[in-house]
Structure formats: structure tokens, C-alpha cells
Amino acid sequence: MTTQIHPLAGQPAPASMLIDVARLVSAYHADVPDPTIAAQRVAFGTSGHRGSAFDRSFNEWHVLAITQAIYHYRKAQGIGGPLFLGIDTHALSAPACASALEVLAANGVDVMLAVNDEFTPTPAVSHAILTHNGGRSQGLADGIVVTPSHNPPRDGGFKYNPPHGGPAGQKITHWIEAEANRLLEARLQGVKRIPQAEALRAATTHRRDYLNAYVGDLGKVIDMDVIREAKLRMGVDPLGGAGVHYWAAIAERYRLDLTVISEVVDPTFAFMPLDWDGKIRMDPSSPFAMQRLVDIKSRFDIAFACDTDHDRHGIVTPGVGLLAPDHYLAAAIDYLFQHRPGWAQHLQTPAAVGKTVVSSRLIDRLTATLGRQLIEMPVGFKWFAAGLQSGVLGFAGEESAGATFLRRDGSVWTTDKDGIAAALLSAEVTARTGFDPGQRYAALAAAFGSPVSRRVQAPATAQQKKQLAALTPKHITSKELAGESIESILNHAPGNGEPIGGIKVNTAGGWFAARPSGTENLYKIYAESFINDAHLQRILSEAQAIVDAAISQERP
């Protein structure tokens, strides 16, 4: 199983590969999904419903149905406060936001839109929800972010954040998904809607300055003084995303030497280098997508980027270039749990470290040395929301370059991923310690081992994906992996006992995890070795053989 790199990866996209925005938006309004076709139904994945108008998987009917379903959920749960509505810069986000507002206004929901129709990062919406709900038991707020995250320009996405401020959990998304599909099957009978112009004038439609509310609070989570006093030269590439105007405001408010590489917003994302597979993808953890910033890394002491809704980060140092996501997570954990005295002063119990089952084992070793509890969850940031809100978790991070952490005083910051705060933390680390995160990770690797890791994927039918998700330890008959005895086989996360949607196999010197993709006909294998690259290759090869054998077996 090898990942085929596209010959144009890392290079500008030819004009022929750019989307026709007008045609895409026209398809959004004109094409009607068929709910008898599985691919055209509402389906919430790891974070929201995603699809493309070209495929009839993200069209106006989907958004109308999902929004009405969210209203029904709010009503059933007694959620009576405002709904914070944010969007990113994908071509389908603005029309989908308009559709959602038409339904919300028709149903009498107080909606908070951004002033001047400013783009709205996911963390700014999470921050707004938590700020409103602080100290309240009634009139609680929730939110919607219209974003497909780092997905290609042809895609749209729609995700719901309940009153805890983070991504909705499975119980909620299953309820909304079922209700939305019922409405689709009824050809939108039961969906209330008013024209956009009327919705914008409605007494329930309000404007909020998300940008200044969020930027004004950033000093409560990041030590801006130490960054400014160190006179760090910083660079940021917003990748044409929702935080594109936030960075200049941050630099001005906190008087930082922060250069914004580009503030261009283009729904074709023509400025993006192609990703590994030849697609345009605003992924700040991809060395191909990040080529523009990596090429000028020597101009800055530290540089960073965020994806389209600014919930994910990418860190670039002069010596290393783009850091692997797990490398930065480890450096961030090591720093935070030694430089946040306010956490110990204000939290009743020591804050724990949250990671997913596919994140590096180096984090386990580091956390143990720090004397902190490790809470290992399934993939999906929704699993961390409650722990972040309560202060049980001081930090939560995913190997896909998503993380957030508590404010400096130990109170909750966001319960969704925050690429802006994670990016700025890299500057605080550099300023306070004199070593950038790449250098700090090198020291951690010297102390705890220098793992090599990789994520690859392979084709799988819908039935095989179901079988993989349903695997249990008894279906894995192998006793060894890459020359080592298998120590444990997991299909539930140690941190909460929830299914991981696949399988994880551990040995003394490495591990692999396999899980089906939520959106494509393939499965993913994550692997790590603390021995060497040859050992990693053996793990990957044997992992695919183990998984292929397991998913080809007849199930009783």
C-alpha cells in the first residue's frame, strides 16, 4: 500500500483544475438531492455534513432540512438563547448561510451574524457560545459553522455546536441527521422559510463583532507580552480562510511583528499549491499545501498557517520547515504544563492531557513524565468538549493538527479546535524558552525516543468499511506484528470506552490503527515505530494484510 504522489503536487493549480464558482452555486440552488440514494442523504461525519453541489450531496435542500432539524432539536432541548452563525470562505458557504438564515428567521430564532458579513473562524464561534453561556443555566446559546474545513473548493460543509461550544456528539448528530432526512423524504414539508431579504430585516437577526470579541480575549490564553518583548519576526499564511482579517487585528492590538503573507480571498483557491493527490486542499499539515510558506521560512523566527475555518494549524520553523502535527502537539504539551501556573492555582485537580488513539505514543511517555493523566479518545474533537469545559483537560489535540487549551487562569477558552491560539502558542514557546518548537521537539525525541510515523490509505467497499468499523480483538488472529509480540488490541478508546470505529494494535516498539473513511470508499492506516523506518514499513505492510484478512472474513 503506497501513496501515489501526483506529479503536480506542491505546484500551482492549472486553470483547468479550478472550479467554476458560478456553476457550483447554480447547482447548489437548482439541483435537488434524491434521499433514496445514500450518497445524497444528510450524513454527519467526524465534524458535520459535507459534500458538493455537483454531486447533489451538499445542496440547498440539505441545508434547509438540516437547519429545520436543528430548530426542532433546540426546541426539544429547551435551548432558547441566540444561535451564533459563522461561515468560512468556500464558495458554497455564503449561499448555505443565507439558506440557514431563511429557516432560522422563519422559526423565530435569534441569530448572531458577523458585522459586515465578516468571515468567522470556528474558534470565534466556540468562543462566542462559551462567553454567552458563562454563568447561565437558561437562555443558552449554540452555533452553526458553515464550513467543510480544509476540503477542496467544490465542497460545502455544515456543522452544529451545542451549548458546550464544541462539535456536537454522536447522539445529537444522529438525531439531527434522522430528522433532516425525514424532511428530505417529505420534500421539505414542515420546513419553514422566508425570503433572504426579509430574514436579514427580521427583529431576530442581529450583528456581532466576532473579530474584536475574539481578538480582545486572546491575551487571556496566550502571553502576548513575552512575544512582543522578544521581538520575534513572525509570518502567517491564512490560506485564504475565515481568519484572513483576524491576523492584522491581532498584530495591531498586541503590537506584534507579524507579517500576513497574503489576505487574498478567492473561492477557487487558485493561489494554493496542489496537495499530494493533485487536489486543492487547504491543509496546513500538508507539506505540499504549505509549500508557499515553507519556501520563505528563513524570513521568520517562527511562521504558521491555518485551514479554511481556522480550527487547524501548521507550524513552520527555520530549521525544520513544516513540523509534523504530533511533533508540535508534543512540544506544546511539554511547554504548557510547565508554564501555566494559573492552572494549578485555579483548578481543583491537575489538568489532564487529551489525545486521540492515533496520536503519537511519545505524548504518552511525555505526559507520564509530567505527572499528568492521559485521556485517550476516539478520533473526533467532540470527545474532548466536556473535559475542556470542566477544566479536566488542560490541553486536547489531534494528529490531524487540531488543538485547543485552557486560558492562562485555567478557565475554558474554546471547546472546539483553535488554529489561531495553537499557532500563536508556537511564538510564545519560542519567545519564552529561546527555542522554537522544532528544537524543543528534538530534545523530547532525544529523551523519549524518536518515532517515525505515517498515515496511508487503501480502497474499501461500503461493506468492508462496515466490517472494519465493527472489528473486535477476536477478529485479529495474528500474534505478532513486525517481529514483536502483540501486547494489546483495542476497539474502544481507553479514555471513555467509546468505539474507535476500527482497531488499534500495540507492540512494545510500535502500533497501528485502522479505521474507515467517513466520506470516501477507503480505509486509513496510521502507524508508528520507535525502532526505525524499516520497522515502520513492516508494520504498515503487515497491518494491511491483517486488516484485509479481517474484513474479508464472513461474519457470523
Residues covered by each model-derived region:
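An N-terminal, well-structured beta->alpha segment
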Residues: T2-A106, L200-M234, A242
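Flexible hinge/switch segments at interdomain interfaces of large molecular machines
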Residues: T36-T46, V191-P195, I261-T268, G518-T519
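Phosphate-binding chemistry for phosphorylated carbohydrates and sugar-nucleotides
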Residues: A15-L18, R23, A27-A30, D110-S126, ...
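Ferredoxin-reductase
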Residues: T2-P14, G78-H164, D364
